[in-house]
């Protein structure tokens, strides 16, 4: 993996673009296949905290791995589970009440579009997303129970570094790509 190094001045000249971990500059509202990089997705999701930080640090990457584990049956289904929140690597995570507010239609559309591009770039069948939703909802209920309910402390939250590593291990084990 070759990382792109730029100066602060070069970064300033790229208004409207987001710099990724690997040094790419992307427009998150207009992603294309060349923008998508699994290392960026893993790194970004491992540094985004679920539940707007209300609980312990628990990354979107760790959540995504656990959803993937629930989506067993086929590699494509598990891969769709792993990548169901991948658009958040470029758009960030929003709390569900905010994301689903009437005024957030443009965000939801951007997230859907980014998901389609990511799935296309990584060869994942987007038809699995509806089935993944059931397991995502199940994981949400488990997470609430682990952090604030009857099973507080039952989940060991990973560091961002561990979550990133585990995310990439899961991705490469499902795709057979190294």
Put a short name on every predicted segment.
Residues 1-178:
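Metal-dependent phosphohydrolase cores
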């Amino acid at each position: 993996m070759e990382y792109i190094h730029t100066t602060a001045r070069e970064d300033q000249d790229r208004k409207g673009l987001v710099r990724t971990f690997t040094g790419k500059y992307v427009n998150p509202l207009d992603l294309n296949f060349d923008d998508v990089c699994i290392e960026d997705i893993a790194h970004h999701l491992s540094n985004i905290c679920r539940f707007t930080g209300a609980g312990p640090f628990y990354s979107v990457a760790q959540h995504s791995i656990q959803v993937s584990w629930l989506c067993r049956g086929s590699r494509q289904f598990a891969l769709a589970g792993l990548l169901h929140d991948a658009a958040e690597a470029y758009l960030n995570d929003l709390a569900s009440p905010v994301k689903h507010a009437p005024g957030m239609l443009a965000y939801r559309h951007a997230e859907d579009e980014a998901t389609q591009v990511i799935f296309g770039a990584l060869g994942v069948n987007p038809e699995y997303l509806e089935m993944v939703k059931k397991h995502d909802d199940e994981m949400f209920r488990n997470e609430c129970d682990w952090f604030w309910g009857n099973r507080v402390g039952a989940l060991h939250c990973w560091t961002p570094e561990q979550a990133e590593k585990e995310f990439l291990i899961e991705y490469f084990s499902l795709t057979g790509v190294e």
